[in-house]
């Protein structure tokens, strides 16, 4: 019997638990026809995390063996795009950053999220990259991209950033922080 999902934001988990799912995979085809940079502007609790999770499984080169199981009975199962399971997916999740305290604390938390995303990426694909967590987040990303490029792989990175709005809204709500970041 199908279950009603509650607080499930991981696509694979939702499918394995046999939960109801409103198929939104037909949008993948449409999104691929758009620009390379996509931003989803929807209110909180509107399914962005689940949608980006579904995108992650669809585009992830490591999910190729699970495609039939995860996407049967969906639009994209019968109409796959040429980008199906064709990327190394790098995902950042900025949820949970605390905006109380000073700017240095927030920047440290932001850098931790970047570092954790990079570590997850390297672990998932078994890349033995050296990333210095004490560097600025931009330098960590630059290091990752340089090392990735040096491998001369045929597949590219697909970047997914979740809860980017949580991070920016937190800064916008604090006028002192906002002033610091726009200088």
Locate the predicted segments by residue:
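Phosphate-binding site recognition
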Residues: 1-183
